[in-house]
Amino acid sequence: MENTRRSFLKKVSAAGIGAAGLAMAGNAGATTTAAEPQKKKTAGKDDGKLRFGFIGTGSRCHEHINNVLAIPGNKIVAICDIQQGPIDSTLKHIAKFNVPAPKVYKGGEREFENMLNNEEFDCVIIASPWEWHVPMSVAAMKAGVPYVGVEVSAANTLEECWDLVNVSEATGSHLNIMENVCYRRDCMAALNMVRQGLFGEILHGGCGYEHDLREVKFNDGTHYNYVPGSGDLRMGPTAFAEAQWRTNHSVHRNGDIYPTHGIGPIAHCMDINRGNRFLSLSAMATQSRGLHKFIVDNGGENHPLAKVNFNLGDIVTSMIKCSNGQTIIVTHDTNSPRPYSLGFRVQGTEGLWMNDGDHVYVQGKSKPHRWDDSDEWFKKYDHKLWASLESQAAEAGHGGMDYIMMYDLIDAIRNKKPAPMDCYDAAAWSAISGLSEMSIARGGALVDFPDFTRGQWIHRQPQFAL
């Protein structure tokens, strides 16, 4: 098992090194035809319960399990991981619900393929390290799983983005990107205000991922976060959880490597892939200082990791132009000391919402040149999903948005509806990573967004959270 884990982590590291090199248009010219999943599966086979599988059994998997089992009519058929520790933790977690234990697939790094080929699922959730999101999603769709939920970001390169689109179209399987921030209560209220015209014609959006992850990117191999004062800083195979693989991206890549928390809600406000699309992007990055400084400050100048050259700029800024004229600024900032923010801004001809400061201004309704507290507006324009599910979501992760997201996906599965956030959303949002890397490598040059819908965006209608 240990050899398998080390082999896996070595491949993760190699994938990180090659990520920027793979950021190319890939299959942009490929065409596919829609088809039904090659394995016909009935939602709620036999006992009427939806059959779920999980690939990757870390902490994010536990959050999803909580919500799958909190919503009536679901069961967990199988789980898969290459490490025994997370498997044991997940089995213990599931046992708290007094439900049958799932079948366990473990051992080799391709064991997930055996799980997909041996079991029948209504949905498989993928919560693995980033490098495995696309291979596992593709395998699940090709195995005929009707709905595949992939954690964020869905893909690391443009080639991978095209893989998700092409395979979803070819197999008929519904790929859903599990972007929980799209279900954040304030984001859904703001979307409601946009759709009701409170902000007028939308002109501009701002968003990002501004989250101090220094204590996540390094730890002592036992604790999820770095233990202050310990001086025990590790990354890679000897570290624990995300520090085993995530920090490697900061070594070998320079771009917005985690864009979807921010861009997802803004994309919905601008009807991206549904009457509008991203046209082009330009990105720039600051110098890389934060991670090295964190190592020296906590481990000393002679710490082995002080010799690591981190490529990721501390702050990466991308500007996107949309076909309907809007602009969007996306910021990635995970290596700096700072409070958490996703920096949302939705601005139109009649007003705007600013997440930082909790501000709303609506022309003709707000006092001139004075901000309103966003709470008073968001209570009035609370989205119906939140209004109806508030009590159920109250105890769920991330303030309840995880529950709302899973509820919406399960509703789609039961009613055989399209995925709430489909393969085109997954590709367009995730493509910011590869495109920003390309742009930065070219000195901030403007790069074109692929049209992952191949022209369908012109006629597609909004479907999210209607």
Swiss-Prot record:
Free-text function comment from the UniProt entry: Glycosidase.
Disulfide bonds: none
One Pfam family matching this protein: GFO_IDH_MocA
Description of post-translational modifications: Predicted to be exported by the Tat system. The position of the signal peptide cleavage has not been experimentally proven.
Cofactor(s) demanded: NAD(+)
InterPro entries: Gfo/Idh/MocA-like_OxRdtase_N, Gfo/Idh/MocA_oxidrdct_glycsds, Glyco_hydro_109_C, NAD(P)-bd_dom_sf, TAT_signal, TAT_signal_bac_arc
Enzyme class: hydrolase
GO molecular function, one term: nucleotide binding
Residues engaged in binding substrate: Y209, R246, Y258, P259, T260, H261, Y340
Signal peptide start-end: 1-30
Keywords: Glycosidase, Hydrolase, NAD, Signal
Phylogenetic classification of the source organism: Bacteria, Pseudomonadati, Bacteroidota, Bacteroidia, Bacteroidales
Binding site for NAD(+): 59-60, 81, 130-133, 151-152, 180, 241-245, 258
Cofactor: how and how many bound: Binds 1 NAD(+) per subunit. The NAD(+) cannot dissociate.
Enzyme Commission number(s) of this protein: 3.2.1.-
Protein name as annotated: Glycosyl hydrolase family 109 protein
Family: Belongs to the Gfo/Idh/MocA family. Glycosyl hydrolase 109 subfamily.
Domain of life of the native organism: Bacteria
